[in-house]
Amino acid sequence: MEDFVRQCFNPMIVELAEKAMKEYGEDLKIETNKFAAICTHLEVCFMYSDFHFINEQGESIIVELDDPNALLKHRFEIIEGRDRTMAWTVVNSICNTTGAEKPKFLPDLYDYKENRFIEIGVTRREVHIYYLEKANKIKSEKTHIHIFSFTGEEMATKADYTLDEESRARIKTRLFTIRQEMASRGLWDSFRQSERGEETIEERFEITGTMRRLADQSLPPNFSCLENFRAYVDGFEPNGYIEGKLSQMSKEVNARIEPFLKTTPRPIRLPDGPPCSQRSKFLLMDALKLSIEDPSHEGEGIPLYDAIKCMRTFFGWKEPYVVKPHEKGINPNYLLSWKQVLAELQDIENEEKIPRTKNMKKTSQLKWALGENMAPEKVDFDDCKDISDLKQYDSDEPELRSLSSWIQNEFNKACELTDSIWIELDEIGEDVAPIEHIASMRRNYFTAEVSHCRATEYIMKGVYINTALLNASCAAMDDFQLIPMISKCRTKEGRRKTNLYGFIIKGRSHLRNDTDVVNFVSMEFSLTDPRLEPHKWEKYCVLEIGDMLLRSAIGQVSRPMFLYVRTNGTSKIKMKWGMEMRRCLLQSLQQIESMIEAESSVKEKDMTKEFFENKSETWPIGESPKGVEEGSIGKVCRTLLAKSVFNSLYASPQLEGFSAESRKLLLVVQALRDNLEPGTFDLGGLYEAIEECLINDPWVLLNASWFNSFLTHALR
């Protein structure tokens, strides 16, 4: 086919087709049918324009090539065949000088006589199907469409064929000749079948036999065959259709399409009530680490050994006491539980050899904290089905909570940089293809921006805790196992570091189903005084357990060290997802990649390097009451990562519902900003669906508050 194209078409046309394919990254050695189609289309555009001029009186005249009057103004401006940038420049220039409406897609020609853009189509299928596809794609009454086929058929907007009979006959004859030449070389069948629909994703597979019969039988009423239905769908114009259908429905259905204007949306109503409280499985910005650098002790890497080594680095332990009680809990039991952990760790140190794992004694305080024997007894349904007043016990509605400032502070802190490196660059083999090289470059730049981020620390902490808890839940089902909360990182100088955040004690864990719950008690170190924001720590009992000497500008200062203790629970499926938290890195990298791709397609080259190395440029990060916040590309990477991490840490049905429902409103607002004149019905119902997800979850309430800021600034 390639040889045929080079013989059959003018070298200038072949060169333009080669350029066009290169611009779109297509290989003409492989896509030979496409190469032929582009050449054919170019030739038809040139033939359409040839010999047509406008004289001094503004009349259209036909002049042969050797005529001395060839200096007359060309009737048609050829846009097809130019590179994209030049083509758009020509289109913009025409629009500015003639007042024509700017088309959404690049047309092929401009007709100075009729003052309209023209889209030329050359099809190997039926002209009406291709015409409908073109019209459906362009969606503009201003652009004139003219379709030619290889069989001599043609179709044009409003049957206005623009050119005289003879000029069109020349084009049809040339197309018929190309078809004959291809057929004589055995190339026509392949060429005919290779035509794709206009900008559609699906291939037009030939459906035969049983599948074809089933397709024809499965159509809506009034359609005799699949092709008719396809043509109808391709040419379907949705405006006014929904209203028409609604009017045919039951009289009880009275949905009216209301125009959605800048004044239409109202802010989302956030609930009133006491401030929301912390509900993550482990402490975030308030966590304190006991650390060892360059660990080389015996048993290094065994969690219990590492934990004991970290505990030995602190010398300020003191008699613990409760500073912030848990309102509903038996606080002395939390205090006794911590004392028990200290005592049993001391027992281990006195032993000759430290064991790999530690099962706690089943004391009354731990049994209470872990809910041992608290579950209601299960009775077989057959034994009680005759009881007349058998019913499920009533459960209280959750109490509404209001947004509190601590969750925004948590998020801001998650976006910040720490002085440690939490992820290493993956060791991946040499790049083979150019695309791999670009992917590696993007990954390396992104990793450099987020490796020090606190959100990345949360990922590694979450992965470790969930992995350890799931392992213990399966390996020691009946035991109250002590699980150290550990993470590993590197200092800026590259030295390895092991960190201890506290401990978890796991309850009984016979987890048969994914949703079966294992209870655990978490005990976490902190320097945060809980009395500063008591509402945040509603679910915790907080002890003061020691004094820590900290270096400051005025020398060493002593600060009280606290232990945040609470009963919590999780399930197999939650732990499984917790172990997968590294996916957050991938999700945010993909979001950054789509930003790079958008920039690259505008500049027509890969912009990865410029994107990350142009430190002066700022990018939108998010909305706040002050307006659109902007920051460096590193800040954008870390903010996107923090959002993804918080979606994982604060995953809940409230978040699922809010994300799904608010997205609908977001799409309508974006359509309004794009001047697409959106319409809605039952907007009140959508607000209701969004607001019923705003109950007490801090992350959902913060997202709703951000959404309101977006609404305010988007509709100015």
Curated annotation (Swiss-Prot):
Assembly: Influenza RNA polymerase is composed of three subunits: PB1, PB2 and PA. Interacts (via C-terminus) with PB1 (via N-terminus).
Cofactor, how bound (note): Binds 2 manganese ions per subunit.
Keyword set includes Hydrolase: yes
Localization in the cell: Host cytoplasm; Host nucleus
Binding-site list for Mn(2+) 2: E80, D108
Family listed: Belongs to the influenza viruses PA family.
Segments carrying motif Nuclear localization signal 1 (NLS1): 124-139
Requisite cofactors: Mn(2+)
GO MF annotation terms: endonuclease activity; metal ion binding; RNA binding
Keywords, alphabetical: Cap snatching, Endonuclease, Eukaryotic host gene expression shutoff by virus, Eukaryotic host transcription shutoff by virus, Host cytoplasm, Host gene expression shutoff by virus, Host nucleus, Host-virus interaction, Hydrolase, Inhibition of host RNA polymerase II by virus, Manganese, Metal-binding, Nuclease, Phosphoprotein
Disulfide bonds: none
Any one of the GO CC terms: host cell nucleus
Protein name: Polymerase acidic protein
Binding site for Mn(2+) 1: H41, D108, E119, I120
Top-rank lineage group of the source organism: Viruses
Record PTM: Phosphorylated on serines and threonines by host kinases, including human casein kinase II.
Chain's role: Plays an essential role in viral RNA transcription and replication by forming the heterotrimeric polymerase complex together with PB1 and PB2 subunits. The complex transcribes viral mRNAs by using a unique mechanism called cap-snatching. It consists in the hijacking and cleavage of host capped pre-mRNAs. These short capped RNAs are then used as primers for viral mRNAs. The PB2 subunit is responsible for the binding of the 5' cap of cellular pre-mRNAs which are subsequently cleaved after 10-13 nucleotides by the PA subunit that carries the endonuclease activity.
InterPro entries linked to this entry: INFV_PA (IPR037534), PA/PA-X (IPR001009), PA/PA-X_sf (IPR038372)
GO BP field: cap snatching; DNA-templated transcription; symbiont-mediated suppression of host gene expression; symbiont-mediated suppression of host mRNA transcription via inhibition of RNA polymerase II activity; viral RNA genome replication; viral translational frameshifting
EC number: 3.1.-.-
Motif Nuclear localization signal 2 (NLS2) per UniProt: ranges: 184-247
Pfam families: Flu_PA
Organism: Influenza A virus (strain A/USA:Albany/12/1951 H1N1)
Primary localization class, coarse: host cell
